[in-house]
Curated annotation (Swiss-Prot):
UniProt organism field: Saccharomyces cerevisiae (strain ATCC 204508 / S288c)
Function: SNARE required for targeting and fusion of Golgi-derived retrograde transport vesicles with the ER.
Ranges in the topological domain labelled Lumenal: 240-245
Keywords (A to Z) from UniProt: Endoplasmic reticulum, ER-Golgi transport, Membrane, Protein transport, Transmembrane, Transmembrane helix, Transport
GO biological process, alphabetically ordered: protein transport; retrograde vesicle-mediated transport, Golgi to endoplasmic reticulum; vesicle fusion with endoplasmic reticulum
Single GO molecular function: SNAP receptor activity
Pfam families: Use1 (PF09753)
Assembly, per entry: Component of a SNARE complex consisting of UFE1, USE1, SEC20 and SEC22 or YKT6.
Annotated localization: Endoplasmic reticulum membrane
Protein name: Protein transport protein USE1
Amino acid sequence: MAETSNDPFLSYVLSSKQLTNLNRLRRKAVTKQLGSSDDNKVSEEFLRYQHTYQREAFEYLQTKHDAHKIMESQYEQYQSSSKTRRYSIDLDSVDAVDTESQTEYPNEEFIDRNEDSEAVMELRKRLLGKGQNKGLGYETTKSVDRQIEDQDTLQQDLIQDMSKLVGSLKQGAVAFQSALDEDKQVLGAAEIGIQVASQGLMDVSGKLRKYDKSKLSYLFYITVFIFMILGLVFTFIIIQLFPAL
């Protein structure tokens, strides 16, 4: 049987706890029923839950629902009573309360205003970064305008410096790209010269294979040597001419 209590909150908590325990028993019974080898046979715990705990679970659920409804109604009554209490004020007693408070604390409003003004001044000093300047009125406004102008000037200087830095970086990137292009041209010319020299060497080696070693004379070796030197000189001249172009 579900436990009853005059306190709806206590009934709600107890019913929730009992429902949690019954839910654990239900899961345990279902797990054993599913894990049993004989599917046609119903386990003892499952039967016990169906005959005993199922009715108790329904009673606890009903008790929990009733307690929740009671708490909702109590909360709505509290809200409505607080609203009516807020607006049900005796207008005749307002003047008396105000006059009494004014007579008892005549300097309270003045002290509050002084505290507010001091707090505002302290906050202004912190924001403006002032030292011990306590001037008010025109001097304070003038100093604030001067600081704003200084900040604007500083921002303009920073913008100009950043623009100059970006321009110099752009010029450096363009110069670096042009240098890379020149190096690419030089490497291309050197590659052409090397290909020409290698082609000449391949031609010479092919011709050498056609002749017999006995037919080669000193004049042929000298001619081959001169041809190799001329090929290297031609490659060097090509490398020197392309950067100038």
